[in-house]
Curated annotation (Swiss-Prot):
The keyword Nucleotide-binding applies. Residues 58-219 form the Alphavirus-like MT domain. Residues 728-879 form the OTU domain. The active site is at 783 (for protease activity), 869 (for protease activity). It comes from Turnip yellow mosaic virus (isolate TYMC). Residues 571-729, 859-887 are annotated as: Disordered. A ribonucleoside 5'-triphosphate binds at residues 976-983. Residues 946-1103 form the (+)RNA virus helicase ATP-binding domain. Residues 1104-1236 form the (+)RNA virus helicase C-terminal domain. Keywords: ATP-binding, Host-virus interaction, Hydrolase, Methyltransferase, Modulation of host ubiquitin pathway by viral deubiquitinase, Modulation of host ubiquitin pathway by virus, Multifunctional enzyme, Nucleotide-binding, Nucleotidyltransferase, Protease, RNA-directed RNA polymerase, Thiol protease, Transferase, Viral RNA replication. This is Non-structural replication polyprotein.
Length: 1844
């Protein structure tokens, strides 16, 4: 610590580097050794973890490895840990020879290597297999122990009697017994499936491997015992998932301390030494706590582990806020859940944490702290708190005393009559002498009493006599009260009465209650205590203990006790019998290479019968080592295992006497396991359609995501998916054929139940019912049953039970009935059962269902929806709708009857399409001009011409459309999900004779090629397959348009109108996959309405299945796929040679094509099918992809998709693709969310059509039909005053007075945790206001100037368009004039200067970027150079010189003052904007928004000053929208600095921050002199010219005040890493960052003091503006500073200096009258004078009240404008406003009238008003938001004086 302080002191000097030289020199050797030993590039987030394991890696390696951290751990294990253990000649098992050679060079005791090929992959790792076992007494087993059972290790020790020690490395997550969630997901992930644990190192799927799920049991045993053989198991070291175990022969001797003689002392401090100790092991995990279980619920432990820091912060937060809403804990959790350090926490754990915090908010500890109390009050409090416990303890004791007389019968003295005396005179008994009670006298009386007792009861048992010890004890007890006993009646004489009197004598009698009564009393007392415990709350102590145990749980530690393991038998260590060998002689002296055994032992021949065909047996086969060499640290390729591979060897023959029992910790010993393990077979699939299995199972992408996308799947490891046959619904067994409730063949319903049915209504396939009703639950979507029940008066339950007597269960409960409801097939069955005929009124007209030979009729109405619905009764229509299509057309009839593989074509009717001439004309016009298509651009000037050119043909069609009337043509639309088989049935249809006159139009040449290949027509018929342009020039009877939505809008109309011979159009396409977009900016095709909406009514049904996509993609979309291939969703670093590459842009596609890859854009791939996995390229345009393009990319391949590029584009953040993120993270893709306006309108069918009947579905429950609201996806509006979600409202302490903090209940939940919401820590003293006596001033004399006359000729005649610019062929709009009102001049007065209006000028911000922003060359952080450090130090020294500070001195940090600054900053943030504005900007506190990212937008303003008047186009001022975290954390730092700057600032330096115009006037009058000229300066691009030196300067300023280091580091990090939507920025100043004005002012002041010897010269600074009273000499070191600065000065020597819009001088200050004159003109023409007049008047009064001296401040050219402004206010202002021009103080009532409408009141005008009026104005809702609060500025100026 002292050395660090010394280094900090030497930091500004040149002595720091020599002081650090010894330290750097001492680290060179260790760094060099680390780089040589661990040369791999380790991810930076894993480097601290490896260092905490004790691995000395520097992280400076450059070699890349797919799992570098595991490789580092393995190297440390081998070269350091094992090398230290190998003290004798040793053998090594399961290691590559090359790795063993390196290990042997490190330690020569590694003599022998034994490898065994036990898996096909071993042949690639081990060139030879060893026929024998190791020979040395020490063996090192490398990463194979997890595959061996303890019985096999015991077998190894038994086979090798000389084996003493076995060092084994074990790779298994210690938390595997909790769940599948890793504690270090960046280091490893794993999943457990049945009895297999799949381990993935660092997201590298290719390096993953499988092992038994109980391998972690090796960490739970400490010994292995078999009979008299014992092996001890010791865990030497653990590095996360890698453990080093030592298994050695024998057991350690007992601890001698356990055999020590027991001690007799109760207070033995070493008693635990004589007790056996537990063998407890623990493993390192993140710092976590375990949440309590929910009441009466069982929650997994892994879902209750949360970070301790987050829990403690959330616990404090929920009790610190004044108002807590139900959403606040969830928002607080969200802030922390996205942090990389908490990636190990499960989503359920986060949910449980926020729920636990929310529900336990009301709990508080029931404690009191009473210190200054009397003993009686303390006793009373104790009894009130613990009376239950005292009562519970005392009642049983008191009840037990009732039994004491029964079991210990003590005699009780009772009165007995001795004699009676009557009628005698009064006699007195002899008075005994009165003696003082002393000990001896009392002892005598007690002895006499004891003698009397003995005399009365001589037969008393001996134990009832009072012993002598008891007498002594009684005397000692009575000694203190002996004076009191002398006055008792026991010692007084009694007077006998004259009345008859009985003389009594006392005798001892035995008295005892019955034992039954005693037991009853005891039972009643115990029962009362029990009832009290049952119905009363816990005691205070119990409440206290439960509260702290429940809300303050201890840290969770991953530990358990290790126990011995007993095994009944051994299992063979190897699957073959090894040969015997002897140990070679010790050759440690010679450097001989290790020996390898080169004999390969073949496997035993397979059994005669297949193992799978044998029936299961009760005796399990002994285990064999499972993949013992498939280790975590080896990058093995994915091997394709063919179906002809060698069968695994049979297990070794076991002796019959072996029992099948096995250890509990390793249950795999009892389960038969084939060797080696393969993927699970799928016997229900046909072999022809079953893809060959991979050597690794499919991995969930959430467990294999590499943050840097370094993980990849090698292409050649993926087998080509099977070539699918023709689409058929019989690929998978139909549920109807396997239905156990049915019998017989599958036949149409009308054949099984013959009656007269309407045509095509009873042709659906079914089977006879064989079993009675199974009482299936009634479906939720039962509107059909309700409609039939209402008409037939049969209950819905009876109707449902009747259906279960005629239809199989598979047709009653399936996916269709669950999602679409019951259909007309069920209606037909009901009509047959109940003998009625139903007329269903649908969109197609009335349709009859049910037998025609019945007289009972019912009416049902069917609405299409969605959702569709059956309702009882007939729908009343004005006219009967006519049926669509042309049933008499032979083409359409043929299509309706055509079948492919037993399935009908998925359409209902042909729709008459009326062509639109306007659509066709739009498209042909764009084609003619070359905006859409390329035919008109083809060069046909060369070659033989046989007809018109393509362009001439297009022109002819264009002319033809001018005179051709529109026509109606039948259109059939086939729509469905990607790969549903839309194309194949149409191709089979076109092969028929009736449809031979056809042509096909395709959007791309790739799709046209697929059509040619599939149709297999003669070469002369190839003209029938065309691209969309050439198809228009040809003619046919039938037109097939494939991917209609990829055609230009209006293409269907143009195709119909261009071909008079066309009779039928068949269109194919998926409206969800997007539509055509022209690449020409001049095309007008986009102005036509979308084709998806025009063609939507033609979609009769949408095929919701796929033959293409693999199962992993189908699960995402929740769709059924007939492709049995599992597929893959992964990531690659480089594309594979055969895989197609899908890009976002044509440029990227051309690049990949030029590199030799097969590539196309995502949009152009629509309609294509790939066999290899599609590689999706992720780049900057990924986040802009539409949902349609995302759907296309994910559904192109039969094998899956692989992403290539940065993982941030699939990370689920704002800058990523939502659909790709869902796919990559294995989240369901909800189609309603991605296609909210289109998908709900599609009529889905889930299986191919097997019948052409009019089948209708009802998908609404029996209630009335519901329809989705068009805005169902929009959240409801919540008013700001909403308080029903308040969980708790904490009141302030009563002695704090009224609440001065602003409300925070309206803040977004993500922002509220950023507020400290601290009450004012310091009460400011009362401020006394002093009123300066008014001084008599001469009123100024104005020369006559008429405002209107001067304004009429002020604006020169010019063309506003000449002052605009062109940006990307678009004109700017800074001088709008069209339709703008004007009255003063010949043009609108707004043309005086440029007006910045981002809403009306789209070029404003893009055209200003190059001037206002400075970008870094890359995303890397800005590097602070040596010149930046030097210049920053020079500026800091100059700034200290300006404030008369010592650069090396520091100021102690004041926490109380900083807390007050926090309150001020939050007050300013809450009061500067309205509540609605803060709520609307909730995204500013989004936790997913990186703090270094700012959003740049243009500032809307009409700036009028000398530089902008009559100027041309001007770049806008850019504002930076930063995260609320930055504003709320760094804002107090700047306010804290401002307080000290205000206190230290010399009087000759004026800073305009927080100053009023009156203060500016007073300072000028006091300090400015009459010397001329004065130096005024402004900078060009001041903000952009600040580089790294500004960061150094700001950091040094904060260090001087001892600002906490983490805040300084945060500031430096933000400045060097800032990025925007336009790119990364340099360290430039951003308007909007905390302290922009203060830092600019300090930078400007530091530059001035670096340039001049200022001394006591008055200086004025405000941001980049400055003014020096008179010329100053230049400093000698100024040239060295100037060469490092990037500033561009605009120095001006003037006699009339202008500062912040005011002309200043010794007389005071006056507002620039020229700018004010222009503003008044603009306000008049804009008709906004009433809103702005008061503000302009208050600005004018600042100079007007100076009197005659104001003319000394103005240049002569501005006198007329000052006079014109005075004339304007005198003519246009009402009388009460003109009172401000008077020097006297106006009355408060007058000011209140003046400020009755302060909407456009400026900041300066606000400063001039009294505080009462300012508060009243700021409370108005229409008041303009000010950049800073005046009250806050006033508090800052007064704060330091009473804090210090």
């Amino acid at each position: 610590m002292a050395f660090q302080l010394a280094l900090d002191a030497l930091a500004p000097t040149t002595h720091r580097d020599p002081s650090l030289h010894p330290i750097l020199e001492s680290t060179v050797d260790s760094i060099r050794s680390s780089i040589q030993t661990y040369p791999w590039s380790i991810p930076k987030e894993l480097l601290p973890l490896l260092n905490s394991y004790g691995i000395p890696t520097s992280g400076l390696g450059t070699s890349h490895h797919p799992h570098a951290a595991h490789k580092t751990i393995e190297t440390f294990l081998l070269c350091t840990h094992w090398s230290f253990q190998a003290t004798t000649p040793s053998s090594v098992m399961f290691m590559k020879p090359s790795k063993f050679n390196k290990l042997a060079q490190v330690n020569s005791n590694f003599r022998e290597l034994k490898n065994y090929r036990l898996h096909p992959n071993d042949s690639t790792r081990y060139p030879f297999t060893s026929p024998d076992l190791p020979v040395f007494p020490t063996i090192f087993m490398h990463d194979a122990l997890m595959y061996y059972h303890p019985s096999q290790i015991m077998d190894l020790f038994l086979r090798k009697p000389n084996l003493e020690r076995l060092y084994a490395s074990l790779v298994v997550p210690p938390e595997a017994h909790l769940s599948d969630q890793s504690f270090y997901p960046k280091l490893y992930t794993y999943t457990t499936t049945r009895h297999t644990l799949h381990y993935v190192p660092e997201g590298h799927e290719a390096g993953s491997y499988n092992q038994p799920s109980d391998a972690h049991s090796w960490l739970r045993i400490n010994s292995i015992r078999l009979g008299n053989h014992h092996l001890s198991v010791t865990i030497l070291e653990s590095w996360g998932p890698v453990h080093s175990l030592l298994i050695q022969r024998g057991t350690p001797p007992p601890d001698p301390s356990l055999q020590a003689p027991p001690t007799l002392m109760a207070s033995d401090l070493f008693r635990s030494y004589q007790e056996p100790r537990l063998d407890v092991v623990s493993f390192r995990i993140p710092d976590a706590i375990e949440l309590p279980q929910a009441t009466f619920l069982q929650q997994p432990l892994r879902d209750r582990l949360v970070p301790r820091a987050v829990y403690n912060a959330l616990f404090t937060y929920t009790r610190a806020v004044r108002t807590l809403r139900t959403s606040d804990p969830a928002a607080f959790v969200r802030m922390h859940s996205s942090k990389p350090d908490h990636d190990w926490v499960t989503s359920n754990a986060w949910d449980n944490l926020q729920t636990f915090a929310l529900l336990n908010v009301p709990l508080r500890p029931n404690v009191v702290y009473h210190v200054l109390q009397s003993p009686i009050a303390s006793l009373s409090l104790y009894l009130r708190q613990h009376w239950r416990r005292l009562t519970a303890t005392a009642v049983p004791i008191l009840s037990f005393l009732t039994l004491l007389q029964r079991f210990l019968p003590l005699p009780i003295p009772l009165a007995e009559v001795k004699s009676i005396t009557a009628f005698r005179r009064e006699l007195y008994r002899k008075k005994e002498p009165h003696h003082p009670l002393d000990v001896f006298h009392l002892q005598h009386r007690i002895r006499n009493y004891h003698s009397a007792i003995s005399a009365v009861r001589p037969a008393s048992p001996p134990h009832q006599k009072l012993p002598h010890a008891l007498q002594k004890a009684a005397l000692l007890l009575l000694r203190p009260i002996s004076p009191l006993l002398t006055a008792t009646p026991f010692f007084r004489s009694e007077q006998k009465s004259m009345l008859p009197n009985a003389e009594l004598s006392w005798t001892l009698k035995r008295f005892a209650l019955p034992w039954q009564a005693s037991l009853v009393l005891l039972a009643l007392s115990e029962s009362s205590i029990l009832l009290h415990k049952l119905f009363s709350p816990p005691t205070l102590q119990a409440q206290h203990d439960t509260y702290h145990r429940h809300l303050h749980p201890g840290s969770y530690s991953l530990q358990w006790e290790r126990t011995p393991l007993s095994i009944p038998r051994t299992t063979a260590f190897l699957p073959f019998t090894p040969t015997t060998s002897t140990a070679p002689p010790d050759r440690s002296e010679a450097s001989l290479p290790p020996a390898f055994a080169s004999t390969f032992v073949p496997r035993p021949p397979p059994a005669a019968s297949s193992p799978g065909a044998q029936p299961p047996t009760t005796t399990a086969a002994p285990p064999t080592p499972i993949e013992p060499t498939q280790r975590a640290h080896q990058n093995s390729d994915l091997a394709l295992e063919s179906s002809t591979s060698t069968e695994p060897p049979p297990p070794p023959i076991r002796s019959p006497d072996m029992t099948p029992s096995a250890p509990v910790l390793f249950p795999e010993i009892n389960s038969p396991r084939r060797f080696p393990p393969q993927l699970p077979a799928t016997p229900d699939l046909e072999p022809a359609h079953t893809p060959p299995p991979l050597s690794i199972p499919h991995q969930d992408p959430t467990d294999s995501v590499d943050p840097l996308m370094g993980s990849h799947l090698l292409h050649h490891s993926l087998p080509a998916p099977p070539t699918h046959p023709l689409p058929s619904s019989q690929l998978l067994p139909a549920p109807l054929t396997n239905d156990p409730t049915a019998i017989g063949p599958v036949l149409p319903f009308e054949e099984l139940h013959p009656r007269r049915y309407p045509e095509n209504t009873a042709t659906f396939l079914t089977r006879l019912r064989s079993l009675p009703s199974n009482h299936l639950p009634q479906p939720t979507l039962n509107c059909l049953l309700s409609a039939v029940s209402d008409q037939t008066k049969v209950s819905e339950e009876h109707l449902w039970e009747s259906l279960q007597t005629i239809l199989p269960d598979s047709q009653l409960s399936n996916e269709e009935t669950n999602t679409l409801g019951l259909s007309t097939e069920h209606l037909t069955a009901l009509a047959h059962l109940y003998n009625f005929q139903a007329t269903v009124y649908s969109d197609r007209g009335p349709i009859l269902f049910g037998p025609s030979d019945t007289i009972k009729r019912i009416d049902i109405t069917h609405t299409t929806g969605p959702p569709s619905h059956f309702s009882p009764g007939k729908r009343l229509l004005g006219s009967q709708p006519s049926a669509k299509g042309h049933p008499s057309d032979p083409l359409i009839r043929a299509m309706k009857s055509f079948k492919v593989s037993g399935n009908y074509l998925p359409f209902s009717e042909a729709h008459n399409h009326p062509t639109s001439i306007s659509h066709a004309k739009n498209l042909i016009s764009n084609m003619k001009n070359g905006f859409d298509g390329v035919l008109s651009l083809l060069d046909v000037s060369t070659g033989q011409r046989t007809g018109p050119t393509p362009k001439e043909r297009i022109i002819q069609i264009d002319h033809y459309l001018d005179t051709n009337p529109g026509k109606t043509t039948p259109v059939v639309h086939f729509a469905g999900f990607a790969g549903c088989g839309k194309t194949y049935p149409i191709q089979q249809l076109l092969k028929t004779k009736l449809f031979k006159d056809f042509r096909v139009s395709c959007p791309t040449t790739e799709l046209r090629t697929e059509w040619k290949t599939a149709m297999e027509l003669h070469g002369s018929q190839s003209w029938r397959f065309n691209t969309w342009e050439s198809s228009i020039l040809k003619s046919s009877r039938i037109l097939v348009i494939d991917e209609i939505y990829k055609m230009p809008r209006g293409y269907l109309d143009l195709s119909i109108l261009a071909d008079p011979a066309l009779e039928l159009v068949i269109i194919l396409g998926d409206p969800l996959q997007g539509e055509y977009h022209s690449q020409s900016k001049d095309s007008s095709n986009h102005r036509l309405p979308s084709e998806t909406l025009r063609l939507l009514p033609y979609i009769d049904m949408y095929c919701w299945w796929s033959y293409r996509i693999p199962q992993c993609i189908a699960r995402l979309f929740q769709i059924h796929s007939f492709n049995a291939w599992q597929g893959v969703i992964g990531s690659v670093s480089t594309p594979h040679d055969q895989s197609p590459v899908l890009t976002n842009s044509h440029a990227s596609s051309l690049t990949f094509n030029s590199l030799g890859y097969r590539s196309c854009t995502i949009s152009s791939s629509q309609g294509l099918t790939f066999c290899d996995p599609a590689i999706i390229v992720l780049d900057n345009y990924t986040k802009w992809l539409s949902s349609a393009n995302g759907l296309v990319a994910l559904t192109r391949s039969r094998s899956g998709v692989q992403f290539m590029g940065p993982s941030s584009y699939v990370g689920g953040t704002n800058g990523s693709s939502a659909m790709f993120s869902d796919a990559f993270n294995n989240s369901l893709i909800i189609m309603d969310r991605y296609f909210p306006s289109l998908f709900p309108q599609l009529k889905l069918i889930t299986s191919p059509l097997t019948t052409r009947g009019p089948k209708l579905n009802g998908a609404t429950p029996s209630a009335s039909p519901t329809h989705r609201s068009p805005n169902f996806h929009l959240p409801p509006h919540i008013p700001l005053s909403y308080d029903r979600d308040f969980v708790t409202v904490n009141s302030t302490l009563p002695d704090q007075g009224p609440e001065t903090r602003l409300d925070t209940h309206f803040l977004p939940p993500s922002r509220l945790p950023l507020h400290f919401d601290l009450p004012p820590a310091i009460t400011p003293p009362p401020v006394s206001t002093s009123v300066d006596p008014p001084q008599a001033k001469a009123s100024p004399v104005y020369p006559g100037e008429f405002f209107d006359s001067l304004a009429a000729f002020f604006l020169p005649a010019h063309d506003p368009s000449t002052r605009e610019i062109l940006h990307k062929d678009q004109s700017s709009n800074q001088f709008p004039w069209f339709d703008r009102p004007f009255s003063l001049s010949c043009q609108p007065s707004s043309l005086i200067s440029a007006k910045h209006a981002p809403n009306h000028d789209p070029t404003l911000l893009p055209a200003s970027i190059n001037k206002r922003l400075r970008f870094r060359p890359s995303d890397s952080p800005h590097q602070i150079t040596a010149d930046d450090v030097v210049l920053g130090l020079q500026l800091f020294h100059s700034l200290c010189r300006a404030y008369s500070r010592q650069p090396n001195s520091t100021v102690p940090f004041n926490p109380e003052l900083f807390a007050e600054c926090i309150s001020l900053n939050e007050y300013a943030q809450l009061s500067s904007k309205t509540q609605s504005t803060i709520v609307a900007n909730a995204s500013r506190s989004d936790p997913d928004w990186r703090h270094t990212t700012v959003k740049i937008f243009a500032k809307a303003q009409h700036k009028v000053n000398d530089g902008s008047i009559f100027g041309s186009w001007k770049a806008c001022q850019t504002l930076a929208l930063m995260h609320d975290y930055v504003i709320l954390v760094l804002g107090p730092v700047k306010k804290y600095q401002r307080i000290f700057d205000n206190a230290d600032r010399p009087p000759n330096i004026y800073s305009h921050c927080g100053k009023t115009p009156n203060q500016l006037r007073d300072w000028c009058q006091e300090h400015l002199t009459h010397s001329t000229p004065k130096i005024a300066n402004d900078y060009t691009a001041f903000d952009q010219s600040q580089h790294g030196e500004s960061v150094v300067l700001e950091a040094l300023k904060m260090k001087r005040l001892n600002i906490p280091s983490h805040l300084i580091q945060l500031h430096v990090h933000l400045k060097t890493n800032v990025s925007t939507q336009f790119g990364p920025l340099t360290c430039m100043r951003l308007t909007g960052e905390p302290g922009t004005y203060d830092d600019n002012t300090d930078y400007n002041l530091a530059v001035i003091y670096s340039q001049y010897d200022v001394g006591s010269c008055p200086i004025m600074v405000s941001g980049d503006d400055s003014l020096i009273d008179h010329p100053l000499p230049t400093r000698h070191d100024w040239p060295s500073v100037l060469k490092r600065l990037h500033l561009r000065f605009k120095l001006e020597l003037t006699s009339h200096p202008l500062f912040c819009g005011y002309y200043v001088g010794p007389a005071g200050c006056i507002r620039n009258p020229l700018a004010l004159f222009c503003k008044l003109m603009i306000a008049v023409d804009d008709d906004a004078l009433d809103d702005r007049r008061l503000s302009y008047l208050t600005e004018f009064t600042t100079g007007h009240l100076l009197g005659e001296s104001l003319w000394h401040l103005l240049p002569e050219t501005h006198v007329q404008y000052q006079s014109a402004c005075f004339d304007f206010f005198c003519r246009r202002c009402p009388r009460h406003e003109k009172m401000l021009l008077d020097d006297s103080t106006p009355a408060l009532s007058l000011l209140e009238r003046i400020t009755s409408s302060p909407r456009w009141l400026t900041k300066n005008a606000m400063y001039l008003l009294p505080a009462k009026l300012r508060l009243a104005i700021t409370s108005l809702s229409q008041t303009q938001s000010f950049p800073e609060s005046i009250e806050v500025s006033h508090a800052e100026s007064e704060l330091l004086h009473y804090v210090q």
